[in-house]
UniProtKB/Swiss-Prot annotation:
Positions of substrate binding: 42
UniProt protein name: ATP-dependent dethiobiotin synthetase BioD
Protein species of origin: Neisseria meningitidis serogroup C / serotype 2a (strain ATCC 700532 / DSM 15464 / FAM18)
Pathway: Cofactor biosynthesis; biotin biosynthesis; biotin from 7,8-diaminononanoate: step 1/2
Matches recorded under Gene3D superfamilies: P-loop containing nucleotide triphosphate hydrolases
Classification lineage: Bacteria, Pseudomonadati, Pseudomonadota, Betaproteobacteria, Neisseriales
Organism domain of life: Bacteria
Length: 215
């Protein structure tokens, strides 16, 4: 791996933050120079909570890039989608600020993992969806899914969107932490999605996040 990767999910609260932190930790253990970024954090006042979770999982303190807000360029107080949180805070989301911060991180680190807010179709602004931004920046996507009920549908919809927009899927991360309590559903979801990934995105990697990785 090298460059900037966008971590998205099939839904809200699917485990993107833990997945991002665990992947960054694994890369650190491999001797890679890696940093995570949360370009838009909502529901916070000062520090991006997701970045704090990343650092805890990675086993490192807050970095200089964190102190300079390069890893958390836009923070809004209301816990909502970025476009609504920005409106309620009475200011516009600054896409140029986000792009510049990511570029600066990419110049300093071998790998940058950018954790998005929610799923691919979450609005960043009134006119721009998250998937539009990913396409504009030509970022490969790391998609987080799970074995809970509904995940097959949401994952296949995400696959279809990535294909429609011509975006490369780097990997699908199956998050066991958010599995269904029904073991049959969880296991079938895993086997089905593993087969669909091979059929739809043959070059993409399959990864799994174990329950023991929960923070």
């Amino acid at each position: 791996m090298k460059g900037v990767y966008f971590v998205s999910g099939i839904d809200t609260d699917i485990g993107k933050t833990v997945a991002t932190g665990m992947l960054a930790k694994q890369l650190l253990q491999q001797g890679k120079s890696v940093i995570t970024q949360k370009p838009v954090q909502t529901g916070c006042q000062d520090i991006a909570e997701d970045i704090a979770v990343h650092r805890k999982i990675m086993g490192i303190p807050m970095q200089e890039a964190d102190k300079r807000r390069l890893t958390m360029p836009e923070i809004f107080s209301y816990p909502a989608s970025p476009h609504l949180a920005a409106r309620l805070d009475g200011r516009a989301l600054d896409l140029d600020k986000i792009r510049t911060a990511t570029q600066e991180l990419a110049a300093q680190y071998e790998i940058v993992l950018v954790e998005g807010a929610g799923g691919l179709m979450v609005p960043l602004t009134e006119k721009l969806l998250t998937i539009d931004y990913i396409q504009q920046q030509a970022y490969p996507v790391i998609l987080v899914t799970s074995g809970r009920l509904g995940s097959i549908n949401h994952t296949l919809l995400s696959f279809a969107a990535l294909k429609q927009y011509g975006i490369r899927l780097h990997s699908l991360v199956f998050n066991h932490i958010h599995d269904s309590r029904d073991a049959h559903i969880a296991q079938y979801s895993l086997s089905y999605l593993k087969c669909r990934l091979k059929a739809d995105f043959s070059e993409a990697e399959w990864m799994e996040l174990a329950k023991t990785d929960a923070v």
